[in-house]
Every structure is written in C-alpha cells, then in structure tokens.
C-alpha cells in the first residue's frame, strides 16, 4: 500500500503498519530506559502506548487527555486530564501517535519537563 501525503494532510496508516512501527519505536527506546511508566496521549497515543508498553514490559500506563481540535478546526490545546502519576515526568515515557504542529508536545513538556517524548509518526511541515 503506497501512502501519499495529500493537500488535506490526511495520513492513512493501516493497523498492521501502526503495529509494526510502534514495535520499531519500542526497540529504539529500549536503551533509554528503564521507564517508571508510560503516559499515553489520548486518543491517538493509546494504541501505540499499549504496544510500546508490551514490548518494553512496562506495566504502568497513565493518560494525559488533551484536545486541540474543536468542531474539526484546530484551536488552542486544552488539558482535559493531566497525567497525575507522572509528576514532573522523571523516568516516564510520553507516547503519541504523531506530531503535527508540536503544540501538544509543548504543553506536555511544560507539564512533564523531565519526561522522554516519542511519537510513531511526524507530519511533514
């Protein structure tokens, strides 16, 4: 399956590709651990975080619920639920499916300045 990046910024990825790429991400993160736990960025980071957690044998998964899309248009990032267990992020791994503008990452970095942040994909500028 050929993936074409179109003008609408759609980035179709199959479940098999997401699984394979999430496992590959876990293998790259292996030498950076051990991690106390994973913070999955909802909603996109939930599936990759589960795969990474399984590969790295991490049993503690916290969520950070953020929203930047309102009625299908991008707006300011809103924190719906912080990852309270992660505190400043020391020895925690933040997982999201993709980075687009970087705004979500900036908010997460302010919340957890000592965490390691990783995404499966990055959209081209």
Regions found by a protein language model. Name each.
Residues 1-125:
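PRPP-associated nucleotide enzymes
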């Amino acid at each position: 399956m050929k993936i074409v990046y179109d003008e609408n910024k759609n980035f179709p990825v199959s479940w098999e590709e997401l699984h394979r790429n999430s496992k590959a991400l876990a293998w790259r993160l292996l030498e950076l651990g051990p991690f106390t736990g994973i913070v999955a960025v909802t909603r996109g980071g939930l599936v990759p975080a589960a795969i990474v957690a399984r590969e790295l044998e991490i049993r503690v998964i916290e969520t950070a619920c953020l929203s930047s899309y309102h009625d299908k248009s991008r707006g300011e990032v809103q924190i719906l639920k912080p990852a309270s267990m992660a505190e400043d992020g020391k020895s925690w791994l933040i997982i999201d499916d993709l980075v687009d503008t970087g705004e979500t990452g900036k908010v997460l970095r302010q919340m957890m300045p000592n965490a390691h942040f990783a995404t499966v994909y990055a959209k081209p500028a």
